[in-house]
Amino acid sequence: MPSNSAFEDQLATVWNITLGVFFDPGHFLSLFPLFIAFCIAFFVVCHRRQQKTGSAEVNLRRTMLLLFPRRIFLHNSAKLDYAIFFINQIALFAIAFSTVLSPAIVSNSILEFGAVLGLQTASADTSLALRILYTVYIVLLWDFSATYAHYLKHKVPVLWELHKVHHSAEVMTPVTAMRRHPLDALFGAFCTSITMGVGIGAWAMILGQDVMPIHVFGSLAGIWIWRVAGYNLRHSHVWISYGDFWNRIFISPAQHQVHHSKSQEHYDKNFGHIFSFWDSLLGTLYCPKNAERVRFGIGDDELPEYRSLTGLYITPVGKIWRRLAGSPAGEKLQGDTGRT
């Protein structure tokens, strides 16, 4: 029987990887980024209301009901988000997928291979200017890896079956960002580790190994700023567009909401996380001219399969098995909307 100390350690671990996330200043679901997202949404809703009515008066109760409607936050889809968040946090910690392959392991392997070939790492420059440049480089590298992994999740049928769990959300709250099949999360981590490991290793070989990027609360400065500056509104019902010019540089919450649209004209658009110029290169950029009414989810014929925890975890595996073992190459599965 475990000692009290061991039990307390286990309890602390469970807390840290579940509810503790909300108190981790480096996590996008921590209280500070959520509060900033609330402030932005509150201002936007009040401003639009004032433009519509011509009155500067703020109806606090009405505004709060608009920001936190029961029909969204207590929707069955949202409840599944909350459940899958807790289950995944524990499951992914248990398999420790992030330590199986990390950017550090990949970059160190590249450096060791370079040493075998007789290549020497250049001496490091720890000046602030280089640290800023390196931070920008790492942020671009991370965003590129996240974007191309996201692109593959939509274009490769087997990966789409896993990623479909995320897109099956019928309403969106900030927790929807954590609505992922564990294998989907594993693939994303693998792509990021490979890409960033190669990029970090290449930088170390050329400009020096000891350059440290700038961090804020344990997160890369650029990514932390992005998370605080409204990231949580990407998965929400609040439409915020940056305008045509800035939408071509940064992915706005509205653009990501379009990405989640079940309308066919919005399929496979806006794969970027921070920057939208990756989508310009891929030919997948969609910049809404005006506010659009967006219905979230996947095809109505498939949606019922993803309205339970069992469906969210088991259905993708079953469909992948049928694709690989039971269905002839190229043949669509029953209920497949063709969104691959």
Across the structure, where does each feature detected by a protein language model lie?
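A membrane-cytosol interface segment of integral membrane proteins
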Residues: 217, 292-340
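Short, charged cytosolic
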Residues: 2-6, 50-70, 151-167
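Membrane-helix interfacial "entry" motifs
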Residues: 21-26, 69, 73, 77, ...
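Membrane-embedded catalytic scaffold of the fatty acid hydroxylase/desaturase
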Residues: 87-99, 110-111, 120-295
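Coil-to-alpha-helix initiation sites in intrinsically disordered, low-complexity, charged segments
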Residues: 5, 13, 59-67, 73, ...
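Specific transmembrane helices
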Residues: 29-116, 134-146
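Short, strongly hydrophobic alpha-helical membrane anchors
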Residues: 1-23
